[in-house]
Structure formats: structure tokens, C-alpha cells
Amino acid sequence: MAIGVTQNTFQLNIVSAEGPLFSGKAHALAISGLDGELGIRPGHSPLLSRIKPGVAYFQTDLKGDDEILYISGGILEVQPSLVTVLADTAMHGKDIDEARANEARRAAEENINKQGNDINFAQAQMDLAKAMAQLRAVELTQKQRRR
């Protein structure tokens, strides 16, 4: 490949502890890194980042909708033509139980608001972030289906 010339896709592999979720060509990936949102396109500079709980979007077709995933955290490795997401947990938005995510959000908020030293505040915040990310993935998937 000549310097300055990039392909229009990269190989994207998304794997969670439960198994592979996606392996194929992608045009773009947006994911929540520890220091902020990351946008990955073909030819991106090498990068290694921790992933925080959030929604990941990736585009496999320039004309189609984004694929939407909930990612609970993990590691992102980027090479110019290969991107690997090693997720602790990952789910397609359509596979998330909205009622369970709402209950997890409510329980986390309740734990944060409790007075006393018997709660782990950092863990409660992490639980809340995960529940909110799941609900966001559900919301975005539902909006996409309505179009």
C-alpha cells in the first residue's frame, strides 16, 4: 500500500467473554474510550485504549444504518487495517431486556442515594453507568427500527 493511500474499510472483530459478536469489514467505529469518544476509520493510527461502559456504533455499509452495541468495558486495539474490541460484556441493542436495565438503573440510583458507609460508591456509579448505557442502546435501536 502506498503512503497516504487508505482502503475504505478495515477488519473489525468484536469479542466478549460470551463469544464473538461481529467479525467483518467496517467503514467506521465509534466507541467510548476511557478519555472520551473515539472515532475510528480505515488507516487510523495504532492505538490501545481501555473502553468504558457505553454504546458502540459501527458501519458495515455506507448506505445502511449503524450497528448498535452495548459494551460494558474492555480493551480496544487499533491498527491501520484491523480493529479489535475485547469487551467484558457486549450485546446488540435489540437483545437487551429494557425492563431489567431499568431495574438495574433504579437499584444503582438507590444505592448512590443511600446514606451510610455500607455501600461501595464507586461500584454503584459503575452499575449506574452500565445500566444507562444499556438503556441508551435500547433507545437508539428502537429509533432506528422506526425509520
From Swiss-Prot:
InterPro entries: ATP_F1_dsu/esu_C_sf, ATP_synth_F1_dsu/esu, ATP_synth_F1_dsu/esu_N, ATP_synth_F1_esu_C, ATPsynth_dsu/esu_N. SUPFAM superfamilies: Epsilon subunit of F1F0-ATP synthase C-terminal domain, Epsilon subunit of F1F0-ATP synthase N-terminal domain. This is ATP synthase epsilon chain 2. Coiled coil: none annotated. Produces ATP from ADP in the presence of a proton gradient across the membrane. Its main location: membrane. One of its GO terms (molecular function) is proton-transporting ATP synthase activity, rotational mechanism. Gene3D superfamilies: ATP synthase delta/epsilon subunit, C-terminal domain, F0F1 ATP synthase delta/epsilon subunit, N-terminal. It is found in: Cell inner membrane. GO terms for cellular component: plasma membrane; proton-transporting ATP synthase complex. Keywords: ATP synthesis, Cell inner membrane, Cell membrane, CF(1), Hydrogen ion transport, Ion transport, Membrane, Transport. F-type ATPases have 2 components, CF(1) - the catalytic core - and CF(0) - the membrane proton channel. CF(1) has five subunits: alpha(3), beta(3), gamma(1), delta(1), epsilon(1). CF(0) has three main subunits: a, b and c. The lineage of its organism: Bacteria, Pseudomonadati, Pseudomonadota, Gammaproteobacteria, Vibrionales. Belongs to the ATPase epsilon chain family. It is a peripheral membrane protein.
